[in-house]
């Protein structure tokens, strides 16, 4: 900052009575209404440096120019006037007018009243019962790294801030503040307005609730929770295991590092929902309005939760995704990783993809899809014989080629043991109602030595098949795929948790689809 002059007060200092007269463009005066005697400092139209002393009450009129104003422990009265001023008043109960220009105001401790005036101003939060008026412009309330030590709430809608454990303040603390910037590690709760806000937070476990508008939100490290309204957002959740409640359009959202959850509530008026974490985008068809399918860009999210009734298609990525559908008919695909898929209510379609996945259809008639024998052995936790379907899709790793005419067999095999012949024609599904001789990994031991042959002892392979078995001592059934190559090629596709040997007799062809 280029300075035209430096004006320093020569008061009594240390709380003593101020001198009279002038010194270095300073003088004294007494305010009749407050009975406070001020040391007066006056600037010029050029950039000035105006510095008070000790405990003296200082009255500063900076004039135009980009001024530096510093006062200490007195109850000061500061007017920045025009220019981009830096005002630092330290302790004392101060009254500060920033004036026009982009000012930075640090009131220090004390019960201060700050009127930033026109311009894009920054007001630093300090100890004491302050009132901040940002005035015209795009103004920011800034929280320093050591300003707070316990959780704190800032409500831009009501103009109040207070310690989070306490009841909401009934008196407004500030007005005309659009942005919040924090360097603190304390946990903050921020409620913004429907306008354009910029929220930049530190390393605490923060909560941000947006009313809508065109906002930019950066939460930094910590386990943060961000709830968006209807509007256009740029969101960076930073490090930590974060949760984003989405209700936005035309936004760019970066989950950052950590295990992050995308939550979508149907109450925002969405008819259909499509989220692809692998291709990193999201789109909706809202009631009465359609979008082009690229409205929201997603990055580095691991989990998705749908709340309410909205028809959803959710596709995971290579991470270990946790995907939870809502109360409508959902299509959930895990893609890569060891995923957990939960359909919730509705008639859902679940495909774990690669990895060892856990699938729960929830209420409704659900379909569990398998596309490859090399994807890993999944677990279905709630398969219901009366309602649910196992679907097997032809591909190079789950070859069920042939007429596509399914042959379904439910029957007993007296002793399914090593060396047994089991006839499986193309697309044959066999549900065995007699127990296999071993449990647990022993099921694999037995099935991998079974030949799929003609049944005459020659072990001539005639096709691939799906085999459903259970052990007498186990409460679970297992679904295997047996290829044409003979013994040792059976691959476990999934475990049906809670489906017992007795339940296998109730399977029908309707429980299986080969596509």
Features from the language model and the residues they span:
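Acidic glycine/aspartate-rich repeat arrays in secreted/surface proteins
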Residues: 147-153, 160, 269-272, 367-515
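Solenoid scaffold repeats with emphasis on beta-solenoid/beta-helix
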Residues: 39, 48-49, 58, 67, ...
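Extracellular interaction modules
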Residues: 168-176, 292-300, 383-386, 505-507
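Glycine-centered beta-turn/loop sites at beta-strand termini
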Residues: 42-43, 52-53, 61-62, 71, ...
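Short, basic/low-complexity N-terminal boundary segments at the transition from targeting/disordered tails
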Residues: 117-118, 140, 220, 230, ...
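GD-rich hexapeptide-repeat beta-solenoids
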Residues: 3, 11-49, 56-58, 66, ...
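Disulfide-stabilized cysteine-rich extracellular repeat microdomains
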Residues: 46, 55, 65, 74, ...
């Amino acid at each position: 900052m280029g300075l035209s002059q430096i004006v320093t007060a020569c008061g009594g200092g240390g709380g003593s009575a101020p001198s009279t007269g002038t010194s270095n463009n300073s003088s004294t005066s007494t305010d009749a209404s407050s009975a406070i005697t001020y040391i007066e400092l006056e600037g010029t139209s050029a950039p000035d440096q105006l510095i008070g002393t000790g405990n003296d009450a200082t009255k500063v009129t900076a004039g135009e120019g980009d001024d530096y104003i510093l006062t200490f422990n007195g109850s000061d009265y500061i007017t920045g006037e025009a220019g981009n001023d830096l005002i630092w008043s330290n302790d004392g109960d101060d009254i500060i007018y920033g004036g026009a220009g982009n000012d930075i105001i640090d009131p220090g401790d004390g019960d201060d009243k700050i009127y930033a005036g026109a311009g894009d101003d920054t007001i630093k939060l300090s100890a004491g019962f302050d009132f901040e008026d940002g005035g015209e412009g795009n103004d920011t309330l800034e929280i320093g790294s050591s300003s707070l030590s316990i959780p704190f709430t800032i409500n831009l809608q009501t103009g109040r801030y207070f310690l989070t454990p306490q009841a909401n303040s009934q008196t407004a603390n500030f007005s005309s503040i659009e942005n919040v910037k924090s360097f603190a590690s304390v946990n903050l709760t921020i409620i913004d307005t429907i306008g354009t806000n910029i929220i930049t937070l530190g390393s605490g476990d923060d909560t941000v609730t947006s009313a809508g508008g065109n906002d930019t939100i950066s939460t930094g490290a910590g386990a943060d929770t961000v709830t968006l309204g209807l509007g256009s957002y740029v969101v960076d959740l930073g490090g930590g295991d974060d949760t984003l409640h989405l209700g936005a359009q035309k936004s760019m959202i970066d989950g950052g590092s950590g295990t992050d959850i995308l939550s979508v509530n149907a109450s925002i008026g969405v008819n259909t929902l499509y989220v692809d974490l692998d291709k990193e985008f999201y789109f909706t068809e809202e009631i009465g309005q359609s979008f082009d399918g690229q409205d929201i860009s997603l990055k580095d999210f691991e989990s998705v939760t749908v709340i309410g009734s909205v028809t959803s298609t959710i596709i995971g990525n290579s991470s270990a995704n946790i995907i939870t559908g809502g109360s409508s008919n959902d299509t959930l695909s895990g893609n890569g990783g060891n995923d957990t898929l939960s359909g919730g209510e509705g008639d859902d379609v679940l495909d774990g993809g690669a990895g060892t996945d856990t699938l729960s259809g929830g209420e409704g008639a659900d379909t569990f899809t398998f596309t490859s024998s090399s994807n890993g052995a999944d677990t279905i936790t709630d398969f219901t014989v009366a309602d649910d379907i196992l679907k097997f899709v032809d591909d190079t790793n789950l070859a069920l080629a042939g007429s596509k005419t399914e042959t379904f067999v439910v029957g007993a095999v007296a002793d399914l043991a090593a060396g047994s012949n089991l006839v499986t024609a193309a697309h044959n599904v066999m549900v065995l109602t007699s127990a296999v001789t071993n449990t647990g990994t022993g099921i694999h031991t037995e099935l991998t030595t079974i030949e799929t042959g003609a049944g005459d002892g020659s072990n001539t392979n005639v096709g691939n098949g799906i085999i459903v078995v259970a052990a007498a001592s186990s409460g679970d059934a297992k679904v295997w795929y047996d290829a044409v190559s003979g013994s040792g090629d059976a691959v476990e596709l999934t475990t049906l948790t809670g489906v017992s040997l007795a339940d296998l007799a109730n399977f029908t062809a309707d429980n299986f689809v080969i596509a």
